[in-house]
UniProtKB/Swiss-Prot annotation:
Pfam families: Ribosomal_L27
InterPro entries: Ribosomal_bL27, Ribosomal_bL27_CS
Region (Disordered): 1-22
GO annotation terms (biological process): translation
Organism of this sequence: Acidithiobacillus ferrooxidans (strain ATCC 23270 / DSM 14882 / CIP 104768 / NCIMB 8455) (Ferrobacillus ferrooxidans (strain ATCC 23270))
Protein known as: Large ribosomal subunit protein bL27
This protein's UniProt keywords: Ribonucleoprotein, Ribosomal protein
Similarity comment: family membership: Belongs to the bacterial ribosomal protein bL27 family.
Gene name linked to the record: rpmA
Coiled coil: none
GO-annotated cellular components: cytosolic large ribosomal subunit
Amino acid sequence: MAHKKAGGSSRNGRDSESKRLGVKRYAGQEVISGNIIIRQRGTQFYPGANVGIGKDHTLFATAEGVVKFERKGPRQVRTVSVVSAA
């Protein structure tokens, strides 16, 4: 019997491409208008002063300055602001 039995097939072996989410500019870093600060799924962080939000919830600078992270309100909502570099 010079035959080899058929090898088993695997139903695994797939994965999606990483989306490169996360913080792109950290607290204290200088940014210019249009710089992406955070890429996220949903609103883990909310926009504060001088920060806009895209349709995919990306936070970006709308003015020149320094990135500032803070927690606001009774729910301790995480916000990101851009304050003028003093």
